[in-house]
Amino acid sequence: MTAAPASPQQIRDRLLQAIDPQSNIRNMVAVLEVISSLEKYPITKEALEETRLGKLINDVRKKTKNEELAKRAKKLLRSWQKLIEPAHQHEAALRGLAGATGSANGGAHNCRPEVGAAGPPRSIHDLKSRNDLQRLPGQRLDRLGSRKRRGDQRDLGHPGPPPKVSKASHDPLVPNSSPLPTNGISGSPESFASSLDGSGHAGPEGSRLERDENDKHSGKIPVNAVRPHTSSPGLGKPPGPCLQPKASVLQQLDRVDETPGPPHPKGPPRCSFSPRNSRHEGSFARQQSLYAPKGSVPSPSPRPQALDATQVPSPLPLAQPSTPPVRRLELLPSAESPVCWLEQPESHQRLAGPGCKAGLSPAEPLLSRAGFSPDSSKADSDAASSGGSDSKKKKRYRPRDYTVNLDGQVAEAGVKPVRLKERKLTFDPMTRQIKPLTQKEPVRADSPVHMEQQSRTELDKQEAKASLQSPFEQTNWKELSRNEIIQSYLSRQSSLLSSSGAQTPGAHHFMSEYLKQEESTRQGARQLHVLVPQSPPTDLPGLTREVTQDDLDRIQASQWPGVNGCQDTQGNWYDWTQCISLDPHGDDGRLNILPYVCLD
């Protein structure tokens, strides 16, 4: 019989017993056992949020000097990070599914751009002439730009280039790569049929027949699957459910052709894509389904190559005005990545004349027309697709440290500036959930929050200085303390200071100190009604000496404190048969003492 595995709460308790409050290890054996059990335990995101084990393990990793323990803790934290990030990506994909506009039967048909509705179908002869044009050898782009693009592609999370294929596989016409239905939407079986599946390339005749067959199928898509909007000439239509990388590049080029201005002659297709692009496309379609924007179904398109050859103006636009700008930028990796693949020198791509080189430029005006520069869109797309990618295993995440002076001025000598670390995940104490950090920029020194805190701190310091400079004797604090306006102001100031966490003492601090002193002096000035304290007697008749007749006369005829009665501070005499009423605190409270002797 094996013991039941410990719950995350029990593991957390064991870890807390093995470390001190500063995360220093007191019991190394127990910490190693906790790490081992956590490595085997299939923990969930909810358990991590409840127990805050990630923070505890990270603190232990920072404090420990055991390198092996630090490595194991880091590996464990990385695995948890991958566990949390895909959950957020899955939620984004589900939101995209909920807001999508599909067909009447729930989107069971395959998602294709409606090529037949936008223009007349091309004849086989026309396709053949285009085919011949595509076989022309193009120019190769410079190595410097390709290196830059390769770096961008690696940042976007794509795996490296695939192994080289023979020149026989560089046929310009590529049939449909089999799409990956990541969201459960079933595709039509005829679109999956491809003669490339077995051999990796196909003859031109089979490709032309298959294109013609696909053009016939393209007229069967329901009308309500694609709803064009007419709000602006270039960007006014919503994104279609299936935006594929190559299709989106061609749509961008067509959009630039359709914008008002001097008309561009429609030339031959700009780029020829080899079968290796379809492999890139498969991996990219898998990632695109994770980062699909709200309102689009992340389903891969089964026939992007039909758009490559026919160059028909597609009704599918690039961006939807109703989507927020950040989400709109998430489409941009699909617009840039095919160009990156074309520019790789290892991939033996041939470009169809100068048309492809000229075709790279219209993407940038399109971005600037949307209100974003290409550099910022590249940075946003890098950030959007950084999580959950395969390249994490190759490229380790190195957090950047930013040095920020919160006062916005030159730091004084001997004062350390605050160091802020950029993190990918953060714990929200309000919702008690672990969330990806949305703010990727360093906190600026001129941000309004810090300016507000800075001004509030300066006000508190000035107030403290003013109150220190004016002594108590110059102000009638007693009258001020009774004023309702002053009291409300002081209470509000006190709550503000406590909420902002400032340690500077304000006027309320000195007021309370003064009131305490006044209270103590007032208590001293009150008349206390108590018994007169008696010093211990030195002359004790009957103990230190013999009892005499004078002692007996004194007991009977005169007042002898402590012997035949007692006296209070107001001069009243009480014998042992009387009740004594006193006010020991000076607050008008009465203390009644019963008689010492009862003569009933």
Swiss-Prot record:
Protein name, entry field: Mediator of RNA polymerase II transcription subunit 26
Biased composition (Basic and acidic residues): 123-133, 207-218, 441-461
InterPro entries: MED26, Med26_C, Med26_Mid, TFIIS/CRSP70_N_sub, TFIIS/LEDGF_dom_sf, TFIIS_N
UniProt key word DNA repair: no
Protein source organism: Homo sapiens
Keywords for this protein: Activator, Nucleus, Phosphoprotein, Transcription, Transcription regulation
Cellular component, GO annotation: core mediator complex; mediator complex; nucleoplasm; nucleus
Main location as per UniProt: nucleus
Lineage: superkingdom: Eukaryota
Gene it is expressed from: MED26
Phylogenetic placement of the source organism: Eukaryota, Metazoa, Chordata, Craniata, Vertebrata
